């Protein structure tokens, strides 16, 4: 019994580098299987699939999700700061600067 093969990409972006790996995998493969097969975990040992979230075309998915032909599997880095907190601080700084004018 042969399984249909599909084309996918595994992507990991760093601040100054983006790694895109193109693979041909069995259609039945899960996101986790594809990531492990890609070799990206060896290239970037800081990736921890129990910590890093993953997605397909900017939509979060679970590691056991199935993929479709031409899907882009993205491995997300953990946020270093809370976006709400950053916006709040910027607003405070802008308000303080406006009050000094």
Curated annotation (Swiss-Prot):
It comes from the Bacteria. SUPFAM superfamilies: MoaD/ThiS (SSF54285). InterPro entries: Mopterin_synth/thiamin_S_b, RnfH, RnfH_sf. PANTHER family: UPF0125 PROTEIN RATB. Belongs to the UPF0125 (RnfH) family. NCBIfam families: PRK01777.1. This is UPF0125 protein VC_0850.
């Amino acid at each position: 019994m042969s399984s249909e093969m599909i084309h996918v990409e595994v992507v990991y972006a760093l601040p100054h580098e983006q790694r895109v790996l193109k693979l041909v995998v069995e259609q039945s493969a899960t996101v986790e299987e594809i990531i492990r097969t890609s070799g990206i975990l060896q290239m970037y040992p800081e990736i921890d699939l129990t910590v890093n979230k993953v997605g397909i075309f900017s939509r979060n998915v679970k590691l056991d999700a199935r993929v479709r032909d031409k899907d882009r599997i993205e491995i997300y880095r953990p946020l270093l700061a809370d976006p709400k907190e950053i916006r709040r601080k910027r607003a405070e700084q802008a308000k303080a600067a406006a009050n000094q004018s």
